[in-house]
């Protein structure tokens, strides 16, 4: 009687015992070949590398956040970066050879940016404060070349362009351009110019117009941009006066030739 009763109890409990074993065995086989499960396993490994443990099977509520690897998580940085603060921050949180090289590169960028007077410490554009500088005599000479081609060159030489005197109009345009520099170049100062000269010369060797512009003032900042704007606007005006005859005209070699005055002293390309 007792033996029969034990057999009946065992048979009733047998499905409950075997079913989880069967499910576990079947699940293990399916998991090894199911790509979705494989992706989940890879995700779990990545989560473990970040948080120090795999997600709990009982849900996110049981995860032990006290064991997070804080070294993997860095605070968000402002978009306007103070490079000196960033360098100190990286020095305090990184120590490997690669990190040291990155810090050195970071410091070099910050040093280079400190030489750009129109760029602030956080990398933002700024207009330089020149109020502390002394007034001094300043000059700048710039030039450019407009290549016309032989046919257009001959028309300009003979003053046969439909719009009129090419060189005369371009000369006035260049002088006016120098006076408008602070309106055209956003971070330039509004300078009280004392003199502007623009000369245009036809060059038969390469069928071009050679343009030279000079600006001067007595003030706290230089006139390099005024001289370069003068020759640039003069060159554009030559193009505008001649474009009806040819579109194949190029403006080249816009550059500063020399400057004088100011704290940096004199400079010459020659």
UniProtKB/Swiss-Prot annotation:
Catalyzes the conversion of (8S)-3',8-cyclo-7,8-dihydroguanosine 5'-triphosphate to cyclic pyranopterin monophosphate (cPMP). The active site is at 240. It holds the Pfam family MoaC. Gene3D superfamilies: Molybdopterin cofactor biosynthesis C (MoaC) domain. GO terms for cellular component: chloroplast; mitochondrial matrix; mitochondrion. The gene is CNX3. It comes from Arabidopsis thaliana (Mouse-ear cress). Pathway: Cofactor biosynthesis; molybdopterin biosynthesis. Its EC number is 4.6.1.17. Belongs to the MoaC family. GO terms for molecular function: cyclic pyranopterin monophosphate synthase activity. GO terms for biological process: Mo-molybdopterin cofactor biosynthetic process. Substrate binds at residues 187-189, 225-226. Residues 1-32 form a transit peptide. It is found in: Mitochondrion matrix. Homohexamer. This is Cyclic pyranopterin monophosphate synthase, mitochondrial. The lineage of its organism: Eukaryota, Viridiplantae, Streptophyta, Embryophyta, Tracheophyta. It comes from the Eukaryota. Abundantly expressed in the roots. Keywords: Lyase, Mitochondrion, Molybdenum cofactor biosynthesis, Transit peptide. Its main location: mitochondrion. It catalyses: (8S)-3',8-cyclo-7,8-dihydroguanosine 5'-triphosphate = cyclic pyranopterin phosphate + diphosphate. PANTHER family: CYCLIC PYRANOPTERIN MONOPHOSPHATE SYNTHASE, MOLYBDOPTERIN COFACTOR SYNTHESIS PROTEIN A.
